[in-house]
Amino acid sequence: MKFVFIFIFFLSINLYSQYDLKYIGNISVIRNNQKINLDNAIKLYDKDIITTENDGYAEIKITGKSYYIANNGKVNLDSKNAELKKGTIYIRNNAFKSLEEFKKYDNDLQIYADPVPLYAGKMGNIFITSRDEIKIKDSKLLGSSRPIVKFFEVKNSDKKIKIYKSVFGIYVGAQDEKYQFVCNMELKDKTLLNLAIDIKLDFTPPPPKPKQIQGVTSTMTNIISNPQKSKEERELLNGKIYVLYSPTNYADKVYMMPAQGRYSSQFGAFRGYTKDYARYHQGFDIANSNGSPIYAANNGVVKISRELFVRGNCVVIDHGEGVYSSYFHMSKLIAEEGQYVKKGDIIGLIGSTGMATGPHCHWEMRAGNMTFDPLSVLEKNYSDIKDIKNLTRIK
């Protein structure tokens, strides 16, 4: 009976696909929830889990292709496929001469992020640098909220380095422990690259109760009691405007404050309009007298200049590469849809139309169809390799 059991055990092992493994540095393999001893070259099977440490690099042969796992990676083998859980994996038809050669190859492509950790309600940047042109086929930031993460090549002083940049917002109410940046690329030599990099997220917990807004008007009560109209307005902006990406960057590096006056409400404030209606404030409010000018915070193309149900008289400017600024509650619209405006041009006048208790400019910034604190764009944006090298490298 003992011999029959052993025979069945080995037969079940052989029913799984086998894969050759080579590695350098420290790696580990988990099989049936147990860590196995490693020789210099061993056989792997479906359901095995390979983890590479900071100095570990590995190669696996699967159906005639070479799968290369970079350091700090985690891969599950299943049905003749290497499923990436964390880190970076390269898929090639032609093998490297050695894993040392692959290690050097892997170091060419570098990824930087700012800030690290990411912060809920703030603007985020991810930069990919390489000596050769790369095709970024798909990229996502996985978490409770999922901003659009799309990359554009940017010019820089080092002609030997290609830089690809993505700008996005992180939802102000996000409370994740981390987000995961996932991306699929094709390199110049036709190597396929998949990566999954965890980035820590920090956030400010909301107060136990929202701050109640004083002076709620009958107009505001009517807006709150008509959720269908509010939904249609969101679908217009979020589904047809903010999701559009212009490949041209119209904006200067630094934005300007769009109005003068008293700063009446900060971005991210948790506010209650009625007993049952509370929201995070998605913009930055500047209060002033009715009819005071509102300026374009930067260069761009006007996508919306019309009266909306919730936002009142509203102007939305496309600054390119997925970045938009919006200005709500105007008493008068001046900029026209389709018009190119320059930073500092008057686009409208302060008012209290729509969901407003008094005259003010609600200034909103979005990137990747996600709002972020507008004050963050008043500082210099990163675009040159000299600036990027000072950021936190995440790969």
Give residue ranges: language-model regions.
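Sec-dependent N-terminal signal peptides
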Residues: F3-I13
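Glycine- and acidic-residue-biased ligand/ion/polar-headgroup-sensing regions
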Residues: Q18-Q34, D46, T51-Y57, K65, ...
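Polar, low-hydrophobicity, Gly/Ser/Thr/Asn/Asp-enriched low-complexity stretches outside signal peptides
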Residues: D20-G25, T51, K80-D108, K211-K253
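Cationic-aromatic interfacial patches
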Residues: L99-P208
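Surface-exposed, glycine-biased beta-strand/turn segments
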Residues: D198-R311
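Zn2+-dependent peptidoglycan hydrolase active-site motif and core
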Residues: H281-Q282, A296-I334, P359-E364
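Short, well-structured beta-strand-loop connectors
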Residues: P293-K303, A335-I350
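Conserved, short, structured surface segments that act as functional micro-motifs
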Residues: N313-V316, Q339-K389
